[in-house]
Amino acid sequence: MAKDTTGRLRVTVKSAGRLKLSSKLWLERQLNDPYVAQAKRDGLRSRAAYKLIEIDDKYHFLKPGIAVVDLGAAPGGWSQVAAKRVGAADGRGKVVAIDLLEMPEIVGVDFAQLDFLHAEAPAKLLSMIGGKVDVVLSDMAANTTGHRKTDQLRIVGLVEDAAAFACDVLKPGGTFVAKVFQSGADATLVTQLKRDFVTVKHVKPASSRKDSSERYVLAMGFRGVPTTHDADAPMATS
Ligand SMILES: C[S@@+](CC[C@H](N)C(=O)[O-])C[C@H]1O[C@@H](n2cnc3c(N)ncnc32)[C@H](O)[C@@H]1O
């Protein structure tokens, strides 16, 4: 690996000879990304952790003692941040997390490898949660097919399902944070969220790549509409 004139690490033709072009670009981006380096220094599993840190530093919804659900949690950056801020390690707060992929253990985080879109996922999640929660996070990103319309529908569909789940499990006053992509396709979602939450806004943390259409929808002050699931039992925070 060599450094360019700005001192940034570059993948040379020699070092990356056997990598595909997309892998080379990804690797170069990783090597030059200050958040990747910072995550290593801070012991965080992903650069994505800084997105949640930034959003919560501004809006303060992760409080000691609360219960959080983290959808699409692997490799675990958001779960690490949530666990620390709610005090999950010492049992004050609780974090329940799921992902399609495996995720190495995080102290205080109750994790299941699970497809959120699977018919049994809501019931499984509800049994893990054991009651209503204060915050639902979703950093899930649907796999893309390359067909723009299909991808947009899948992305929005995933967020809509996450929002519907949030409305089933949130306590009144609760918060929903979800990754969306700037496409205009989420207009219906925003309309629904405005009905169910006191404030709804889009946020783009500085750590979210500028060249990405990624942003987050932040819905706060859940109004407490009737649920379709029986999640009324008090929260267990063992
Ligand atoms: C951007 S990553 C999440 C990064 C994570 N917030 C962190 O800080 O480490 C998106 C994750 O969503 C997961 N995902 C996508 N669709 C999913 C689904 N239907 N059910 C569960 N997880 C899903 C992917 O497996 C992937 O790990």
From Swiss-Prot:
It comes from the Bacteria. One of its GO terms (molecular function) is rRNA (uridine-2'-O-)-methyltransferase activity. GO terms for cellular component: cytoplasm. InterPro entries: RNA_methyltr_RlmE, RNA_MeTrfase_FtsJ_dom, rRNA-MeTfrase_E, SAM-dependent_MTases_sf. S-adenosyl-L-methionine binds at residues 76, 78, 99, 115, 139. Its EC number is 2.1.1.166. Its main location: cytoplasm. Transmembrane segments: none annotated. The active site is at residue 179. It is found in: Cytoplasm. Gene3D superfamilies: Vaccinia Virus protein VP39. It holds the Pfam family FtsJ. Keywords: Cytoplasm, Methyltransferase, rRNA processing, S-adenosyl-L-methionine, Transferase. The keyword Kinase does not apply. It catalyses: uridine(2552) in 23S rRNA + S-adenosyl-L-methionine = 2'-O-methyluridine(2552) in 23S rRNA + S-adenosyl-L-homocysteine + H(+). Specifically methylates the uridine in position 2552 of 23S rRNA at the 2'-O position of the ribose in the fully assembled 50S ribosomal subunit. Belongs to the class I-like SAM-binding methyltransferase superfamily. RNA methyltransferase RlmE family. This is Ribosomal RNA large subunit methyltransferase E. It comes from Rhodopseudomonas palustris (strain BisB18).
